[in-house]
Structures are given as C-alpha cells and as structure tokens.
From Swiss-Prot:
InterPro entries: Peptidase_S1_PA, Peptidase_S1_PA_chymotrypsin, Peptidase_S1A, Serine_Proteases_S1, Trypsin_dom, TRYPSIN_HIS. Its cofactor is Ca(2+). GO terms for molecular function: metal ion binding; serine-type endopeptidase activity. One of its GO terms (biological process) is proteolysis. It comes from the Eukaryota. This is Trypsin V-B. It is found in: Secreted, Extracellular space. Keywords: Calcium, Digestion, Disulfide bond, Hydrolase, Metal-binding, Protease, Secreted, Serine protease, Signal, Zymogen. Binds 1 Ca(2+) ion per subunit. Ca(2+) binds at residues 76, 78, 86.
Amino acid sequence: MKICIFFTLLGTVAAFPTEDNDDRIVGGYTCQEHSVPYQVSLNAGSHICGGSLITDQWVLSAAHCYHPQLQVRLGEHNIYEIEGAEQFIDAAKMILHPDYDKWTVDNDIMLIKLKSPATLNSKVSTIPLPQYCPTAGTECLVSGWGVLKFGFESPSVLQCLDAPVLSDSVCHKAYPRQITNNMFCLGFLEGGKDSCQYDSGGPVVCNGEVQGIVSWGDGCALEGKPGVYTKVCNYLNWIQQTVAAN
C-alpha cells in the first residue's frame, strides 16, 4: 500500500493509508531473479508492503505499513509461488518512529525485528544504510510488487525501476506545503514511471545504499507528481539506537 492523500488522492492536508493506495512499480521492468536480495515482502494474509533487510534480524519499512500481525518473507521473486529460496519469518516487534504523523505522513519509517535471524546467502542479504543524504540527479533503484497501473492487480514477480532523485525545489513545487525535511522526491515529472499501490515500505537504493522508503504520492506516474520517499539518512541515530535497545 502507498498512502493516498486527499484532495486529489494526495491533496492538501489529510493522508490516509488504505489498501487501495498508490504504491506499485509503474513503467518499470521485471527485476532479474534474486537481483534485489535485500527486498522483503510484508505479508498479512497477502502481500501488503515491501521492506529492506538491513541486518540479519531487522527490516526497514514505512510506518504506514504497520499491521499487528506481519510475516516477513525474504528471498522472494514470484510471491505467488514457492521457488525454493524463500524464508518466512514472523515479526517479533514492530517499532514505529515516535513522531510518525499519519496526517502529514512525516517520519514515515518503521523497524521490524524478526523472531529469528534470517539465513544470509546469495538470495537473501542485507543492504547498507547511507553514509550521506541523496543528491539531486543521483540514479536509484526502486523495487516492489506494487501494481503496474493504479487500481489494477499486483504483479506476481518483483518489479524494478531506475529513477533519479529530484531537487528539493522541484519536489516542493510538485507538492506545495506538503514536503518536510524528512522527505524527498524521485522519478519523472513527465509521468509514466513511478512506484504505486503495494510498493510502500520498499527500498530506494542509490549507489548501493538504502536512501529511501516508498511513502506516498499523488496517484501513480501522473505528470508533475513524482513519488515521495522517506529520507533514511535523517534517521541513522534513531535506527542505531532502536536496534541496540531491542
């Protein structure tokens, strides 16, 4: 799920996480099998969100993806078939950022502790946290099992999208008075390529580091409305302190 904000799906003030949100890859391509080994699927009876494996026992996702009963599925490519590389591990703890605001979608970040450590291998591995914040023009990889077109069913296999980080000025112009210092935009102003429903919580990886979390947007792949992502670099202390304390 990706957050829909009304007025105009992602309008002026209110943000509502719904199961018909806007977060799956539109205009991307099928990822090479197991080429995104840090990608996880959050399952609450079915796939609801993505996430990133950052240690063998911790997953990074979006706060709006919270569900009281989550199973983390690692090593997935086709989420509707058992292919042999999967590891299904229940969540032991889900820790939302204490300042998460569901109305503004600020601080849209959550840590999930697995009940048991994942077995790391070529098909299940971790992604490093960033050393620096992303800069405009940086090419990044977004991945997920979100819908290929807004309102349609999700794909069975993992989708990828290569997209650039946009400048703060472009981001603020696209979403006046909605972008906080904890958000950044990524994508194409001409539309046609974007994350969408059920990509939420998934990774944005730039230069081998997880720089973003799929968070919200106005529809999917609309002209002038790029995707908005949680800026992971702002949360390094919180992540490190939370992991150490739990």
